[in-house]
C-alpha cells in the first residue's frame, strides 16, 4: 500500500499514537522523540501540567525542525487533582490500580500543534470508571507487564479493558490520542 506522508512532524515515540494516526490514514512525514523534563511542578494542576508538557515537546521538536508543523501530545491520569504518570516500578503500578479500584478517574490528553508563532493546544478529558479489583486480578495484571510505560499503569486497549465498567468520552483519548480533536487540529491548518 502506498502511504501518503502528511506534512508534519509527530513529536512522540509512542507506538500507540502512531498506530492511532495510521488507523485513520494519517502518516506523519517525520517521527521524532522530544526528550524534555516532565517533572511535575507542585503549583500545577493536571490541565496546566499536561498542556505544558505537550507544548514543550512541540517546542523541542521545533528546534530541530523549525520549518515544519509539529504535532505533540501528553496523556496523564488524574483524580482529585492528583496526577498519575507512568509508574516507576511494579509496586507503584500496584498502588495506582488499588487507588483506581471501584473509582472514577480522568484521563487527560493535551494535543499541541505548533509552527513558528502558532501554538494550538486542545485538552480532552475522558472519565473512566474501574470495577472493584481484587488482589488476584491486580497481581494477574501486573504479571502481564502491560502496565509498563502507561500513564496510570493500564492500557484500555489491552488486558485491563475487563476492569473498566464505563467510560464517558473519547476511547482513543484513553489509548493516548483523541482522534476527533487531533484530526480537526491538523485539518484546521490544511495538513490533511
Task: For each feature predicted by the language model, list its residue ranges.
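Anionic-ligand binding patches
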Residues: 2-8, 44-192
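A short beta-strand-loop structural module common to alpha/beta enzyme folds
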Residues: 28-39
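Short loop/helix-cap segments at secondary-structure boundaries that form the rim of catalytic
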Residues: 20-23, 41, 63-64
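N-terminal beta1-alpha1 ligand-phosphate binding loop
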Residues: 3-26
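Cofactor-binding loop segments of dinucleotide-utilizing enzymes, especially the Rossmann-like FAD-
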Residues: 13, 34, 116
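Surface-exposed, flexible loop/turn segments at secondary-structure boundaries
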Residues: 16, 37, 119
